[in-house]
Amino acid sequence: MINSGRLSVPSWLVDSPLNTPDADSFAGQMVPGAPMDDAPVSGGQSPWLLRHFGNQFQLLVYANDASQLSAAQVQELAALAQGPVPIHTTVVAQSGQAPAPLATLIDVQGAVAQRYDLQPGSCYLLRPDQHVAARWRQFDAAKVRAALARATGNA
């Protein structure tokens, strides 16, 4: 019996019309349409990034200190979860805890920041199948909603 699951690799969907093309400059392989890269994290139920993503649209937001997000930022990010297609936010940070209702993961080795070319304020819209739908250097709720509409075929 052959375990073909070990031989499979995620598809790269870089030519999909559901992706939002980059408007900002990024290095690395985490382009729209790329499958997410895994990395070690702490602060959640699993020590691996990928275990915290999937089965829903999610926004990964990067911060140096998650506790330093402003009340306005938290309110805007939390509002994304109230839309017709909810987007749940997870803050990945070097330290700190984001205010509720946002989830926080700590980038213990800096691997998430390196693999995703993250700077404070960078954010990634991630699809339920753990592929990158869009990414920006700074959070903009209107751009996130437009990328969600495109990713769901409603643009």
Q: Language-model segments: which ranges?
A:
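Helical substrate-recognition/capping region of FAD-dependent monooxygenase/halogenase enzymes
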Residues: 1-155
